[in-house]
Curated annotation (Swiss-Prot):
Monomer. Interacts with several 14-3-3 proteins, including YWHAB, YWHAE, YWHAG and YWHAZ, preferentially when phosphorylated at Thr-31. Phosphorylation on Ser-205 also allows binding to YWHAZ, but with lower affinity. The interaction with YWHAZ considerably increases affinity for arylalkylamines and acetyl-CoA and protects the enzyme from dephosphorylation and proteasomal degradation. It may also prevent thiol-dependent inactivation. Residues 1-28 are annotated as: Disordered. Belongs to the acetyltransferase family. AANAT subfamily. One of its GO terms (biological process) is circadian rhythm. It is an enzyme of class 2 (transferase). It is found in: Cytoplasm. Pathway: Aromatic compound metabolism; melatonin biosynthesis; melatonin from serotonin: step 1/2. The modification Phosphoserine is found at S205. PANTHER family: SEROTONIN N-ACETYLTRANSFERASE. It comes from Pan troglodytes. This is Serotonin N-acetyltransferase. The gene is AANAT.
Amino acid sequence: MSMQSTHPPKPEAPRLPPGIPESPSCQRRHTLPASEFRCLTPEDAVSAFEIEREAFISVLGVCPLDLDEIRHFLTLCPELSLGWFEEGCLVAFIIGSLWDKERLMQESLTLHRSGGHIAHLHVLAVHRAFRQQGRGPILLWRYLHHLGSQPAVRRAALMCEDALVPFYERFSFHAVGPCAITVGSLTFTELHCSLRDHPFLRRNSGC
C-alpha cells in the first residue's frame, strides 16, 4: 500500500474486547450517521492540535506533536491516523507513523519511515467535553483493528508515563523497558503490541 495515498481506507468496525463497554453514542452509531470514524486529513490538523494542546499542556507542559508535525504526518501517512467525529466535529483522534527500528528513539518523534513495519502511536487525545465516556478505549481498539488490516504493519509501539501502562496493557501492549526518548525531565516506558497475535484477529478468523 502506498503511504502517500490521499484517500486512506475507511477503517472497519471491530468488536470491543471483554470488559470494555461501548458508550451509548457508540451503541447508536448505526442510527446516527453523524457519528463517524475515519482517517484524518491535513485539513483536520488545526482541530487535532487544539484538542491535543488542551489535553497535554496542563499535564505535561508540552505536546507530543506541534501543528506542523501533525500536518506533516497527515500528509505523508493519513492511513496511520484515526479520528472520531460527532456532527462533523473532531472529538478524539490518534496519529501514528511508521518506524523501522526495533526500539523507538529520538528521531522517531518526527520521522515517517515508509518502509517500516512498526506503527508508532504519537498521540491519543480526546476533547475535554467528551472525556470520561469511554471514548479513548473505543478509539484505541478501532485503531488497532485498522492497523491490523494493513499487511505492512506488524506491530504497534508507543511511549507513555508509568501511570498509563496498565491502560495500554488492556489492549495487549506489553512494556519492553524504559524508552530512549526523553522530553525535558520527563521519562517514559516503551510498550509494544504484536498485531499478528492480537485478540481481534483471532476472533475475526473464527479461532
